[in-house]
Design a protein with these regions (language model features):
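Post-Walker A helix-loop "phosphate-sensing" segment adjacent to the P-loop in P-loop NTPases
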Residues: 233-239
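Peripheral, non-AAA+ core regions of ATP-driven protein-machinery
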Residues: 1-226, 232
Length: 239
């Protein structure tokens, strides 16, 4: 099969939009081109991917390789697409099966040796991956962050061979257990310690309850810092 599709996620603040990595192998002079609004780090991934594939004892196809990162209008940055690109090339060239790829989303930077390096924004990715009913595959370096997503299925590996071994069924990876995080309110000064200042305290309570902005103006010594230091103690939990 000369076409393979692998799923990944971009990083956009706390969002992780889906990126479809399409790899097509065609006859012609050997080349590798990446399209789909890639940044510099993504364009440089072709050299990292080539070295990782060769050093993992796979063959790098001597064909014309086109890699499309869709959607085309979404900027792609970082080395997080190294792993899905490498897996797409291996799948399109028939070196690994394509049947299990639709069930996973991959993100990892590749070293030239084939080792997986950590990337930023793994937690938003694992949350979105779980919502899409897929399993996230991340570097071992990001395993602790990825398991914060609760019941989301997460697989972690240290090398490209770990991932290909799982996809081929030779050496399946064990899903990581979810980490339970308990919320703990920080120790804050108590607003009840403030004597008087009834109007100011009332303003703090209204701002905290309604999520309003608050501006304190006044000469030194009138209690602005005293009141501000006690505001966190009456704020509701973050969503």
């Amino acid at each position: 099969m000369s076409l393979a599709i692998v799923y990944s996620r971009a990083q956009c603040g706390m969002e992780a939009p889906l990126v479809t990595v399409e790899v097509h192998l065609a006859n012609g002079l050997p080349s590798l081109s990446i399209v789909g609004l890639p940044e510099t780090a993504v364009r440089e991934s072709k050299d990292r991917v080539r070295g990782a594939i060769l050093n993992s004892r796979f063959e790098f196809p001597t064909r014309r390789i086109t890699i499309n990162l869709a959607p085309a209008d979404l900027p792609k940055e970082g080395g997080r697409f190294d792993l899905p690109i490498a897996l797409g090339i291996l799948a399109a060239s028939g070196q690994i099966p394509t049947t299990r790829l639709p069930h996973y989303e991959f993100a990892a930077e590749l070293a030239l040796s084939g080792e997986l390096r950590g990337v930023h924004g793994i937690l938003p990715m694992t949350l979105k991956t779980a919502a899409a009913k897929r399993t996230a595959v991340v570097p071992r370096e990001n395993a602790a962050e990825a398991t914060l997503a609760g019941g989301a299925g997460v697989l972690a590996g240290c090398h490209l061979l770990d991932i290909t071994g799982h996809l081929t069924g030779v050496q399946p990876l064990v899903p990581l257990p979810a980490r339970q995080v308990t919320a703990r309110r920080p120790d804050c000064a108590d607003l009840a310690d403030v004597r008087g200042q009834h109007h100011a305290r009332r303003a703090l309570e209204i701002a905290a309850a309604g999520g309003h902005s608050l501006l304190m103006i006044g000469p030194p010594g009138t209690g602005k810092s005293l009141l501000a230091s006690r505001l966190p103690g009456i704020l509701p939990p973050l969503d």
